[in-house]
Amino acid sequence: MITFQLEQGEKLFIPFMTAGDPSEEITIDLALSLQAAGAHAIELGVPYSDPLADGPVIQRASKRALNHGMNIVKAIELAGKMKKNGVKIPVILFTYYNPVLQLDTEYFFALLRKNHISGLLTPDLPFEESSELQKNCQSYDISYISLVAPTSKERLVNIVEQAEGFVYCVSSLGVTGVRQTFDESITDFIQQVKQLSHIPVAVGFGISTREQVDSMNKLSDGVVVGSALVKKIEELHDQLLASDTRQDALREFETYAKTFSPLYSFK
């Protein structure tokens, strides 16, 4: 289970990364860099061939990882390897529901527990259809992370009431990806979620600059950053794979990740 003990004024930084991009070994190194940059937890994305919620950046990362043979079982086992190699913060498995359905339920949850996964997030499974998954998560002491979007106001009370770990507040409709601006109605929506929630509220989908982080942190308890970090990994792809440039590339990635972390000031 995930329980964040935030100090007064402390804000969450939850980065997303695709399992196996650019390789399993480097995913572990990148996770350690994110931890060093001040991440409170890591969302580890299972690459999927039909990712409905993902924009082009994460789609490309998924394709690269799938081409290297990554799948849901290997992604879960990769989380265990991350833990063995020094990742101490919680790892949340971000997966579409179809790969989960391909596995026996008991086997899937036993695998999550064996590999020290603390949370599960299934972006394409409607809340109304998630009760079985939520029950299994509770049985295995895993937090089921709930997504809430600006379209789900009528369902908001039920979703937030049952949320665990943190509430993932979707900042805009559509797919993930870098955005320059956000709809003004997001302010009211986040405030509404905050009033209802008994756990931290983090905002994601499109956070790509420090200014956006600071802006969202004024409204919420923190941010989820995905596409911007995955894009940076894509830019550093060749340097990360080459042993003579890998350490420099990891340092560059960590420095970039710090621009989203509330632990570091860039004023």
From Swiss-Prot:
Active site residues according to the UniProt entry: E43, D54
GO molecular function terms listed in the Swiss-Prot or TrEMBL record: tryptophan synthase activity
Entry annotated with the keyword Electron transport: no
Enzyme class of the recorded protein, top EC level: lyase
Keyword terms of this UniProt record: Amino-acid biosynthesis, Aromatic amino acid biosynthesis, Lyase, Tryptophan biosynthesis
Recorded metabolic or biological pathway in which this protein acts: Amino-acid biosynthesis; L-tryptophan biosynthesis; L-tryptophan from chorismate: step 5/5
EC number: 4.2.1.20
Catalytic activity: (1S,2R)-1-C-(indol-3-yl)glycerol 3-phosphate + L-serine = D-glyceraldehyde 3-phosphate + L-tryptophan + H2O
GO CC, any one term: cytosol
Biological function: The alpha subunit is responsible for the aldol cleavage of indoleglycerol phosphate to indole and glyceraldehyde 3-phosphate.
Summary of subunit composition and partner proteins: Tetramer of two alpha and two beta chains.
Family that this chain belongs to: Belongs to the TrpA family.
PANTHER family: TRYPTOPHAN SYNTHASE ALPHA CHAIN, CHLOROPLASTIC (PTHR43406:SF1), TRYPTOPHAN SYNTHASE, ALPHA CHAIN (PTHR43406)
Name the record gives this protein: Tryptophan synthase alpha chain
